[in-house]
Amino acid sequence: MPLTPDHLKMTPFYGFFHYLSWTVYQMWFRGEVFGTENFPMEGPFLIASNHASHLDPPIVGSQVARQMRFFARKSLWNSPIARWWLDHVETIPVERDSGDIGAIKRVIQALRENRSVVLFPEGTRSPDGHLQKAKPGVGLMACKTGVPVVPCRVYGSFAAFGKGMKIPNFGSPVTVVFGPPIPASEYDEPTAGKARYEVAAQRIMARIAAIAEPRYAVI
């Protein structure tokens, strides 16, 4: 992984775990990564990815040579060690299934401060590896800020460490595909009224679903 100017914008703590995540991926879950050229060269953006495994956040984040922000369920902060680590990598706590407006506001503020964020529109890990319906929150955050959204599809993470597995299946390849960024003009529908954020969320999720398996992908 070549050093880039964006690496210098990482805090030392985040940079260490970024490199550690990348190394673990290369050693035990290495598949292929496509589409990293689709990251906007300047300004904030959202990465919206499917979610089938605990492996998804570190693997997706390790492919981006800048400090990203993530969501995590608030209950993880109950552990002092986890709280210390999550705070140091600037993770945003969210109350699952409660429409946590405070967390959404923190994401919007981060984007307005030129920070980029990794989101999982489905809200939680898939129970079977298949895509789930997107929650409207991702649409709200995208529409409120107008930032480009980079769709991401992760293949193989459910087989590597899906819901219900006690230990990872080391050696099972995980492949990541980033699609072209979606401009606000293609996901936002201001005339949709109360359905505006739902429409945006479903359009973003449709772009994730449209990313084919790597052997067929054209990025």
Where are these regions (language model features)?
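Non-catalytic C-terminal accessory region of glycerolipid acyltransferases
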Residues: 2-13, 102-219
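Short gly/ser/thr-rich secondary-structure transition/capping motifs
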Residues: 26-34, 158-161
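Conserved beta-strand scaffold positions in the cores of enzyme catalytic domains, especially
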Residues: 33, 70, 91-93, 149, ...
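A short beta-turn/loop motif at secondary-structure boundaries
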Residues: 37-40, 169
